[in-house]
Design a protein with these regions (language model features):
Chain B
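Helix-loop-helix "hairpin" substructures at the membrane interface of multi-pass membrane proteins
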Residues: 91-99, 105-110, 114, 162-238
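Hydrophobic alpha-helical segments embedded in the membrane of multi-pass proteins
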Residues: 48-57, 73-77, 108, 173-174, ...
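Single transmembrane alpha-helix segments in multi-pass membrane proteins
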Residues: 25-88, 112-119, 254, 258-268, ...
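Transmembrane alpha-helical segments in multi-pass inner-membrane proteins
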Residues: 218, 224, 234-300
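Cytosolic-side transmembrane-helix boundaries in multi-pass membrane proteins
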Residues: 1-26, 204-211, 285-341
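Structural signal for alpha-helical transmembrane segments and their membrane-water exit/capping regions
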Residues: 20-36, 64, 137-140, 181-187, ...
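Short loop segments and helix-boundary regions at transmembrane helix junctions
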Residues: 2-10, 67, 87, 104-147, ...
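Transmembrane helix-bundle core of multi-pass membrane transporters
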Residues: 117, 121-185, 212-215, 234-243, ...
Length: 528, 341
């Protein structure tokens, strides 16, 4: 080893950040850093964008809102060079540009955090953060692993994430993977940062950290385009709000000029209540009984009782073991101890669970929820293929009818049921997963983040649906990082921390404070 | 066919293989006057049977993201087992059943190694490829068994329907039909596609992915053993190296037929078209008296071509879709005028 380039330490990064040129600020007088004018995009028969305008100014957080399938992600993909617009033009600092590739957009310092993390699962965290730009040393240059990890650790710390830079990305949770992407975008010191639904899988604490980072970037003059479906977040964060509906531009104004109702009207075109109110019924006979469930090193001594007509919320921080419990209950993961019974019947495998009437809507829709390359109809029919088929032979007509029926009930926005879910917007993919499991007409339903990435209107729809299902006698276990959602829907709330159930609260006593206290370590709770 | 379905076919790998087949037929017809002849076609069918039979199992295996490199050796081992039994006066039916069982067991071993230990099927079947061949060698050494019962060796011609269609032809046609129905029209086939396209989704939906895979490996071994019977009756002799190198031909056929080596995609129809293509090319090489080494090179070239074609076709389809889009936009039919703000 001859010469060693000084690693880019946090101090050095600070210096480089100071080189961002002075900008007029947030008064709107300056030329937009990035502008889209009359941009359109058509996919096959779908008009995703229809002459949309958007202008991003330096030092502003600009929220882009709209229902699922409104065209938000498509617009961001055009802004970062993944798609080319069919009409219209893009301008950077007022000059027309043509991004043939994502690399061209990166040259203009535009960074993006995609809706679904796109990382290299087999590589370590640090490598993913610096993919293509790893710090080198020596001659011939080799990757300076130590500097890379140190720098990645610094970036992650800046995000408030306690992640091992040497960990394999495939072993991370969705939220953690998102933080890795965020660190990658940060490391590019972009002038424009596009974040497509970054908070959907994060807990309130993580959202707070993320917002702190985003505000810090804004104050240093970065233009930020933020996409999200949680209105309270939008109001907390955004300076300007642009709304799209069905691929069309609706309006763009200062956040202060909007209130919740006006924003929803702009997005949906009608008034929608923001939270569904639960119709509570007297719980019926016990259905699901979990006793002493444990998996070494993941969770232990978990007891669960679900009665017919009852909704039990499972709250906790990301990594508390909620998803792992659900997987073990359904029989996907090995259990080290404990039993699972549905109406007295012992369940061990997913097949037994499904036959007994248990359904599990998993959290990671792209990996576990839908096969994105296969038709919607085939996806919806898969769990009940035996029932839809005739003695083992497929009946495509019935599959399509089934998919259409549930697609309509959930207001799925798709060209037809033969379309591949890969072409659907994120929220609509989620609806396919829901359709698939509701079509099994389960007695007990486990929902893991069922409204992640779902728009306001559809979210209320899903809440109403959950309520209806419970009223009709279904038992529901609701895992959600959306605390208001858990509190509004649940009859009882269980809180998990580090693999243990730390609180079981009746809905009357379940307040945000008590839940958060049980979810975080006592030490922190005392300090707070 | 709707226009969208037509378009999907036009840009499919299968369509590309059909075009290649037509080109190959035209070229070989020009090169040799003996090619365009019913008897020659019957011969091509006979020569392609064993490859085709094994390819019927290899196609779903590739769809489910696995591969069986041991098929040639399994065929060899099965042929040797049959030769030993049949030449020692074991009743024909018993010998046939023992042969098929040998193939099934070989497949079961592959399947269990892959699923129980989570090993890559390339590694496992590369190992068993050597293992099965070694066993065949241990049983017969370098001798050639030719003392097979007449009733068996002549089955090819004796039970022929007319002069062109033989019993093995008919059996293969039935097997191909069954494979196509199972893969594309049955719930098992549907689960195979899910297991190959999104394994985690399949597991979460109650598909027993491992069981499917074991079943397909058993099918692969079984069909290799049946192919061994066909080959033995055709060649009227058995040696330890019977069927060696067959895996290359089978894989060429399956990949040329449009099955995606990354899983999730493949059709029996494509495999059959590719089988015909490889049959025609091999016939052309035989008529042209190409040396053996050159033939292997040609097959290898075809394999490479099929893999590159997959990528090129994908790119073409994307470009065509983009052009259609642009045309529609320029026409402005579905777009509203720019909103004024
Ligand atoms: N590659 C594609 N092929 C075909 N259609 C597509 C493709 N990408 C997007 N679409 C369609 O374009 C429309 C807009 O999708 P987009 O992903 O931009 O929505 P979105 O506003 O991001 O929604 P969400 O809030 O659910 O993420 C949808 O109707 C979608 O089905
Ligand atoms: Mg989106």
């Amino acid at each position: 080893m001859k010469r060693r380039e000084a690693p880019r330490t946090p101090e050095r990064r600070e210096e480089e950040k100071d080189h961002v040129p002075e900008i007029e600020g947030r008064d709107g007088a300056a030329v937009p850093v990035l502008e889209a004018r009359a941009v359109s995009k058509v996919f096959g028969g779908t008009v995703a964008l229809d002459h949309v305008d958007l202008s991003l100014r330096a030092g502003e957080i600009h929220a882009l809102l709209g229902e699922n399938g409104a065209g938000k992600s498509t617009l961001t993909r055009i802004l970062c060079g993944v798609h080319r617009p069919d009409t219209g033009e893009l301008r950077v600092d007022g000059a027309v540009v043509d991004f043939h590739t994502p690399a061209a957009a990166q040259e203009h310092d535009i960074a993006i955090l995609h809706q679904e993390p796109s990382l290299f699962g087999d590589l370590e965290v640090a490598e993913n953060v610096f993919v293509g730009r790893q710090p080198k040393h020596g001659r011939p240059p080799r990757i300076d692993r130590r500097a890379m990890r140190a720098e990645a650790a610094a970036l992650l710390a800046e995000l408030g994430a306690e992640l091992d830079p040497a960990a394999r990305v495939a072993d991370l949770s969705l939220a953690e993977a998102q933080l890795v992407e965020m660190a990658g975008a940060l490391s590019r010191r972009a002038r424009v940062l596009i974040v497509d639904e970054p908070t959907a899988a994060l807990t309130p604490g993580e959202v707070g950290d993320l917002f702190r980072v985003l505000r810090g970037l804004r104050d240093r003059g970065v233009a930020i385009l933020f996409i999200g479906h949680r209105l309270e977040e939008i109001f907390a964060l955004a300076d300007r709000i642009t709304v799209l509906r069905d691929g069309r531009f609706v309006d763009s104004r200062a956040a202060a000029d909007h209130d919740e109702a006006s924003l929803i009207r702009a997005m949906v075109g009608r008034d929608v209540a923001a939270l569904h109110v639960r119709t509570r019924v007297e719980p019926g006979e016990p259905l699901l009984q979990v006793r002493g469930l444990a998996r070494a090193g993941v969770f232990e001594a978990v007891d669960l009782d679900l009665r017919s007509g009852e909704i039990v919320g499972l709250a906790g921080l990301v990594g508390a073991g909620r998803t792992e419990v659900a997987r073990a209950v359904f029989g996907i993961d090995r259990r080290d101890a404990g039993t699972v019974e549905l109406a007295g019947e012992r369940l061990r495998t997913p097949q037994q669970a499904m036959r007994a009437g248990l359904a599990f809507v998993p959290e990671d829709r792209q990996r576990e929820g839908v096969a994105v390359e296969l038709p919607i109809a085939a996806n919806v029919a898969l769990p009940i293929l035996g029932r839809v088929a005739f003695h083992g032979w497929l009946r495509p007509g019935r599959e399509r009818a089934l998919a259409r029926e549930w697609g309509e009930r959930l207001r799925l926005k798709a060209r037809d049921v033969e379309q591949a879910p890969r072409e659907l917007s994120g929220g609509n993919q989620q609806k396919v997963v829901l359709a698939k499991w509701l079509a099994t007409r389960p007695r007990v339903l486990i929902l893991d983040e069922p409204t992640r990435g779902v728009d306001v209107g559809a979210k209320v729809e899903i809440h109403r649906l959950i309520d209806e299902l419970a009223a009709a006698g279904m038992a529901i276990l609701l895992i959600s990082s959306d605390l208001p959602e858990v509190l509004a829907l649940s009859d009882r709330v269980l809180v998990m921390r580090e693999g243990r159930v730390t609180a079981a609260l009746h809905h009357a006593e379940a307040t945000p404070e008590r839940v958060m206290q049980a979810a975080t370590a006592e030490a922190q709770a005392v300090a707070a | 066919m709707s226009s969208r379905a037509a378009r999907r076919f036009a840009f499919s790998h299968e369509a590309f293989t059909v075009v290649l087949l037509v080109v190959a037929v035209v070229v070989v017809t020009q090169l040799s006057p003996y090619f365009l002849d019913a008897q020659n076609f019957s011969q091509i069918a006979t020569d392609s049977l064993e490859i085709g039979l094994i390819a019927l199992a290899m196609t779903p295996l590739i769809v489910v993201r696995e591969i069986d490199l041991s098929v040639g050796s399994t065929l060899g081992l099965a042929a040797v087992v049959f030769g030993e039994l049949a030449s020692h006066d074991v009743p024909l039916l018993a010998a046939v059943l023992a042969t098929v069982a040998t193939g099934a067991l070989a497949g079961l071993l592959n399947g269990l190694l892959v699923t129980r230990f989570g090993l890559s099927s390339i590694v496992v079947t590369l190992g068993t490829m050597a293992l099965f061949r070694g066993l065949a060698n241990a049983i017969v050494g370098d001798q050639t068994i030719t003392t097979l019962p007449d009733s068996f060796t002549a089955s090819d011609t004796r039970y022929a329907i007319g002069t062109l269609v033989t019993i093995p032809h008919v059996l293969f046609a039935l097997a191909a039909l069954a494979a196509a129905l199972l893969l594309h029209r049955s719930t098992v086939g549907r689960r195979i596609f899910f297991a190959g396209s999104s394994p985690d989704v399949a597991t979460h939906s109650g598909v027993r992915v491992d069981r499917l895979k074991v079943g397909l490996f058993v099918a692969s071994g079984t069909l290799a053993a049946i192919a061994a019977l066909f080959m033995t009756s055709r060649l009227q002799s058995v040696r330890a190296d019977t069927g060696s190198g067959l895996e290359l031909l089978v894989l060429t056929v399956v990949l040329l037929g449009g099955a995606d080596i990354r899983g999730g995609r493949g059709t029996i129809f494509g495999t059959l078209v590719a089988l015909a293509l490889v049959g025609v090319v091999r016939s052309g090489m035989a008529l042209g008296d190409l040396p053996d080494q050159a033939r292997v090179a040609v097959v290898g070239g075809l394999l490479l071509l099929s893999i590159c074609a997959g990528v090129a076709i994908e790119a073409l389809r994307r470009r065509a879709a983009e052009r259609r889009t642009t045309r529609r936009i320029r026409g402005g039919a579905e777009l509203r005028p720019t909103p004024t703000t």
